[in-house]
Amino acid sequence: MAGRSDMDPPAAFSGFPALPAVAPSGPPPSPLAGAEPGREPEEAAAGRGEAAPTPAPGPGRRRRRPLQRGKPPYSYIALIAMALAHAPGRRLTLAAIYRFITERFAFYRDSPRKWQNSIRHNLTLNDCFVKVPREPGNPGKGNYWTLDPAAADMFDNGSFLRRRKRFKRAELPAHAAAAPGPPLPFPYAPYAPAPGPALLVPPPSAGPGPSPPARLFSVDSLVNLQPELAGLGAPEPPCCAAPDAAAAAFPPCAAAASPPLYSQVPDRLVLPATRPGPGPLPAEPLLALAGPAAALGPLSPGEAYLRQPGFASGLERYL
């Protein structure tokens, strides 16, 4: 056994056939154990100059809406304007607009009815569309819709694919001054006094003739005339004794239009007597105020009042 090598197999295993040597086949395995077959990592793709795959959008990013096949390239405003432009009277009801769109484009005919809500919202929220009420004698349901005349050039060169800008109806400012109109009637017009003379009765002319007395009524004059009137019976009062002078001083229309001066005064007005002094005082009768139609007569002793000697001018203390 001196010539055998230590690496030779023992004699007990010499009867088994020798195992064929396995040659290595294929490239070495990838260093990434979890890599999917047929897909290379991004680092290897970047090293070879290839574009990396697009990562999936995160939860905070918005996905782009997929393009629906067969959908017309017109906005809802363009669809409504197209329907109104093809109408005979340039106006249509909401149901007629739906019918035009479904007859012209098969996409809206087969798709759900959600697009009708968009048509309705665009009609009410855009100033380029104007609602026209239905006439009382025109039977039917719903109002008409038409295009604002100022929005006729809203699309470029009549093409419904491009719209210039959002149409905004011009409104008058609230502080704009209104044009002057005709004067308002009396209940709504501001109060302004009518121009006229300050005096209702014109002053007497400075012509020849008797001038009227300065005061037509004076207590002192009536008291002084009392002794004379006592023996004359029932003369007319001084205010009515000179009709010619009063007529010359005042026009007849003013005298006829004025009410009686003492129509509300009672027949007799008696002032209470003052406190008597230590000695007897002469009593002077007071002429009572009577109506214009009643005559002035003598007064009874009970209707007199006492004048104190300190007052020389009569009833100034009561005026």
Swiss-Prot record:
Region ranges (Disordered):
1-69
The record's GO CC annotations read:
chromatin; nucleus; transcription regulator complex
One of the GO BP terms on file: negative regulation of apoptotic process
Read off the InterPro entries from this record: Fork_head_dom (IPR001766), FOX_domain-containing (IPR050211), TF_fork_head_CS_1 (IPR018122), TF_fork_head_CS_2 (IPR030456), WH-like_DNA-bd_sf (IPR036388), WH_DNA-bd_sf (IPR036390)
Q: Does the keyword RNA-binding apply?
A: no
Q: Where in the cell is it found?
A: Nucleus
The cross-references to Pfam families, in alphabetical order and at most eight, read:
Forkhead
Gene Ontology molecular-function annotations:
DNA binding; DNA-binding transcription factor activity; DNA-binding transcription factor activity, RNA polymerase II-specific; RNA polymerase II cis-regulatory region sequence-specific DNA binding; sequence-specific DNA binding
Superkingdom in the source lineage: Eukaryota
Specify residue ranges for compositional bias: Low complexity: 44-53
What is this protein for, i.e. what is its function?
A: Transcription factor that controls lens epithelial cell growth through regulation of proliferation, apoptosis and cell cycle. During lens development, controls the ratio of the lens fiber cells to the cells of the anterior lens epithelium by regulating the rate of proliferation and differentiation. Controls lens vesicle closure and subsequent separation of the lens vesicle from ectoderm. Controls the expression of DNAJB1 in a pathway that is crucial for the development of the anterior segment of the eye.
Question: What disease is recorded for this protein?
Answer: Anterior segment dysgenesis 2: A form of anterior segment dysgenesis, a group of defects affecting anterior structures of the eye including cornea, iris, lens, trabecular meshwork, and Schlemm canal. Anterior segment dysgeneses result from abnormal migration or differentiation of the neural crest derived mesenchymal cells that give rise to components of the anterior chamber during eye development.
- What is the protein name given in its UniProt record? Forkhead box protein E3
Q: Give the originating organism.
A: Homo sapiens (Human)
